[in-house]
């Protein structure tokens, strides 16, 4: 099983990164947005991975923090929660935030995640309580750290953010609305990562 990949980041298109190891092999890895936002093109990265096998594909999911991978693995053990939903959950909030919301039994916080309704949120709160209690996550900063990778064209940045949100289950209109709200105060974004962070924060105020 592939558990950790270290190498140079060759390609970034949210939520996928391609990392080439010293052996010359490039691995396509799907990451939750907080982890994706910490990668920088052409720089070295070490990514904890989960190898996921389906009938039609073999996929790698990656995480900067090993504990985040531990949370992902607990999520996909729950009936009805596939890898895509688990990735969406860890994109909408950090592992620390998810654990906090579960401990506080915050149903509203979970229903903000695409694809999770009230009944699903209630079930997740019950099942995750025991699954996450023994996982120690970093609570020192509940907002993920951003190390921006410079991208020049604003239209390209917006298109990439919109595509990333839609791939995680948000509707096109929802993605566009959140991006518009993030830019409403006149702030400009020089990189994809900072706009992603600002846009994700907007979803917290929509519900």
Swiss-Prot record:
Top-rank taxon: Bacteria
Claim: DNA repair is one of the keywords in the record: yes
GO cellular component, one term: Holliday junction helicase complex
Residue ranges of the region described as Domain I: 1-64
SMART domains attached to this UniProt entry: HhH1
MF terms (GO), sorted A to Z: ATP binding; four-way junction DNA binding; four-way junction helicase activity
Segments of this protein annotated with the region Domain III: 153-207
Stretches for region Flexible linker: 144-152
Keyword vocabulary terms for this entry: Cytoplasm, DNA damage, DNA recombination, DNA repair, DNA-binding
Stretches for region Domain II: 65-143
Entry's Gene Ontology BP terms: DNA recombination; DNA repair
InterPro entries: DNA_helicase_Holl-junc_RuvA_I (IPR013849), Hlx-hairpin-Hlx_DNA-bd_motif (IPR003583), NA-bd_OB-fold (IPR012340), RuvA (IPR000085), RuvA_2-like (IPR010994), RuvA_C (IPR011114), RuvA_C_sf (IPR036267)
DNA repair as UniProt keyword: yes
Cellular localisation: Cytoplasm
Principal localisation: cytoplasm
Pfam families linked to this entry: HHH_5 (PF14520), RuvA_C (PF07499), RuvA_N (PF01330)
HAMAP family attached to this UniProt entry: DNA_HJ_migration_RuvA
Domain notes: Has three domains with a flexible linker between the domains II and III and assumes an 'L' shape. Domain III is highly mobile and contacts RuvB.
Role this protein plays: The RuvA-RuvB-RuvC complex processes Holliday junction (HJ) DNA during genetic recombination and DNA repair, while the RuvA-RuvB complex plays an important role in the rescue of blocked DNA replication forks via replication fork reversal (RFR). RuvA specifically binds to HJ cruciform DNA, conferring on it an open structure. The RuvB hexamer acts as an ATP-dependent pump, pulling dsDNA into and through the RuvAB complex. HJ branch migration allows RuvC to scan DNA until it finds its consensus sequence, where it cleaves and resolves the cruciform DNA.
Family note: Belongs to the RuvA family.
Quaternary structure note: Homotetramer. Forms an RuvA(8)-RuvB(12)-Holliday junction (HJ) complex. HJ DNA is sandwiched between 2 RuvA tetramers; dsDNA enters through RuvA and exits via RuvB. An RuvB hexamer assembles on each DNA strand where it exits the tetramer. Each RuvB hexamer is contacted by two RuvA subunits (via domain III) on 2 adjacent RuvB subunits; this complex drives branch migration. In the full resolvosome a probable DNA-RuvA(4)-RuvB(12)-RuvC(2) complex forms which resolves the HJ.
Protein name: Holliday junction branch migration complex subunit RuvA
Lineage: Bacteria, Pseudomonadati, Pseudomonadota, Gammaproteobacteria, Moraxellales
Gene name linked to the record: ruvA
């Amino acid at each position: 099983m592939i558990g950790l990949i270290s190498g140079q980041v060759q390609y970034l298109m949210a939520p996928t990164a391609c990392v080439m190891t010293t052996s010359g092999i490039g691995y396509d890895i799907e990451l939750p947005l907080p982890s994706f936002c910490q990668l920088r093109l052409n720089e070295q990265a070490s990514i904890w991975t989960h190898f996921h096998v389906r009938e039609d594909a073999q996929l790698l999911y990656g995480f900067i923090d090993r504990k985040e991978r531990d949370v992902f693995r607990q999520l996909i053990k729950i009936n009805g929660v596939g890898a895509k939903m688990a990735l969406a959950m860890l994109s909408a909030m950090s592992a620390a935030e998810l654990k906090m919301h579960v401990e506080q039994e915050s149903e509203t916080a979970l229903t903000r995640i695409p694809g999770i309704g009230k009944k699903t949120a209630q079930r997740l709160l019950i099942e995750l309580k025991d699954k996450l209690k023994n996982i120690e996550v970093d609570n020192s900063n509940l907002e993920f750290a951003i190390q921006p990778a410079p991208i020049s064209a604003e239209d390209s940045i917006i298109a990439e953010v919109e595509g990333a949100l839609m791939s995680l289950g948000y509707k096109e209109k929802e993605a566009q609305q959140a991006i518009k709200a993030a830019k409403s105060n006149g702030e400009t974004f020089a990189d994809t990562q900072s706009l992603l962070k600002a846009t994700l924060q907007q979803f917290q105020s929509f519900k």
